[in-house]
From Swiss-Prot:
It comes from the Eukaryota. Belongs to the glycosyl hydrolase 33 family. The lineage of its organism: Eukaryota, Metazoa, Chordata, Craniata, Vertebrata. It comes from Mus musculus. This is Sialidase-4. It catalyses: Hydrolysis of alpha-(2->3)-, alpha-(2->6)-, alpha-(2->8)- glycosidic linkages of terminal sialic acid residues in oligosaccharides, glycoproteins, glycolipids, colominic acid and synthetic substrates; a ganglioside GM3 + H2O = a beta-D-galactosyl-(1->4)-beta-D-glucosyl-(1<->1)-ceramide + N-acetylneuraminate; a ganglioside GM3 (d18:1(4E)) + H2O = a beta-D-Gal-(1->4)-beta-D-Glc-(1<->1)-Cer(d18:1(4E)) + N-acetylneuraminate; a ganglioside GM2 + H2O = a ganglioside GA2 + N-acetylneuraminate. It is a peripheral membrane protein.
Amino acid sequence: MGPTRVPRRTVLFQRERTGLTYRVPALLCVPPRPTLLAFAEQRLSPDDSHAHRLVLRRGTLTRGSVRWGTLSVLETAVLEEHRSMNPCPVLDEHSGTIFLFFIAVLGHTPEAVQIATGKNAARLCCVTSCDAGLTWGSVRDLTEEAIGAALQDWATFAVGPGHGVQLRSGRLLVPAYTYHVDRRECFGKICWTSPHSLAFYSDDHGISWHCGGLVPNLRSGECQLAAVDGDFLYCNARSPLGNRVQALSADEGTSFLPGELVPTLAETARGCQGSIVGFLAPPSIEPQDDRWTGSPRNTPHSPCFNLRVQESSGEGARGLLERWMPRLPLCYPQSRSPENHGLEPGSDGDKTSWTPECPMSSDSMLQSPTWLLYSHPAGRRARLHMGIYLSRSPLDPHSWTEPWVIYEGPSGYSDLAFLGPMPGASLVFACLFESGTRTSYEDISFCLFSLADVLENVPTGLEMLSLRDKAQGHCWPS
C-alpha cells in the first residue's frame, strides 16, 4: 500500500470571532440530482447549554464536486423559550418529504442537570420540507404523541444526531436515546439513571410517530441505524464502557434484543458520537482477502444460504438468529434503489459457527453482500483524527478494520452519507465532521471519497498505533 490518501476537505461552518460556534453535524443526500443538505447547531459558545438554533447549507453534486449555497437559519425549527439541538434528518422516498427531527430544550438547562434531578426539559420536535430543503414548514411538537406516559420515567432524551433511515417496508426510523430513571431516592430528589438507545418510527409516511423499545442491557447513548437484509435492524451506539455497543431488532425497531460490545471499535474517553451507513458491496470485489474481514477466522458468506447455529447464546446477533431464524433462507434482492441499504448476515463471533446449506445459483453469484462504513475519532484518549472504518460482515463485532484517517487533528461528531455510484469512480460517500487545529469545535468540514479510496487506504496492521494518541491540540469531551 502506498502513501495514505487524504480526501480534499471543504470547511462549511467556521467558528466566528464573536464566539458563535457550529457543532453537531447532520448530512442528508436527496435524490435524484443529488442535493446534499448539511445541518448543524449554531451555538453562542461551544457549550451545550449555549445551543441556539439550527442552520443549513445546501449543496449540489456536479461532476464529482459539490457547489455549496450560503448558510441559512431554519427559522421555523424552534419552540419559544427553547434551544434547538441535535439535527436528525430522514427522507421519505415515497413522498419526497424531508423530516428534520431535533430536540428543543427549555432555556439553558444542561443535560447533566436533567440527569441528576430526573426532570426532563426536552421536547421532541420536527419540521418538514417538500422541496429538497429550500423551504420548511412550521414546527410540530411530537412529545406527547410519540412518547406519552413513558416520559415520566425519562430524565432526558435526544434524537440522533445524524441521519435517520427508511426501511423497505416504508417505515421511517429516527435514532434516539434516553436516560431512563431506574430509581429515585430521598423523596425523588436523588435520581439514578442509565442511558439506553432507541428509535422513533412512523408507518404512515410521517403522519404519526411512535416510540420503540429501549436497548435493554448495556449502557448505550447516541446511535445510528442501518437496515439488515432479512428485515433486521442494526444499531451502533456510543457507550461509556470503553467500546461501541451494537444491538439488533427483529421487528424494525419496535424493540431491540440485548446489545453487545464491539471490541474492535474503541471509544474515546467518555465516548463520542459516531456515524454508520450501509451499502451493497460491488460484486467485482472478492471477499477472500482476510485484510478486509478483520479476522483470519472469517470465511466468505454465500449471498443465499440457511443459517444453522452450532453454539447457543442468549444475547446479541447469535442469540437473535437462534431465536428468530434458526433455518431461515436469506437472499439478497437483485434490484434495489441506491437509497435502500442492507447488511450482510453474520454472527457475533467466529463465523465457523455458521454453516452454508443453500447451493449458490448463477443468479446468486451476481448478488453482492452488504457492508458498513463507520466514522469516529481514532484517538482512544482524546477526540483526535477522524477515521473511516469498514466492515464486510457487520453482525460480526470482530469484522471491523483499523481506521483510514481522513483528517489528522482534533475531530468530533460526524455524519456519513451514501451518494451511490458516480461516473469514473466506484461507490461514493460523503462525510460531514467536526474538526479544528487546537479544538474539535473550530470548524465543520465536508469531504467526498470512494469505496476504492477506503479499500486502498485502510491500514492492515499496527500502523495506527503511532497516530492514534499522538498529541495534537486540545479536545474536550461532551
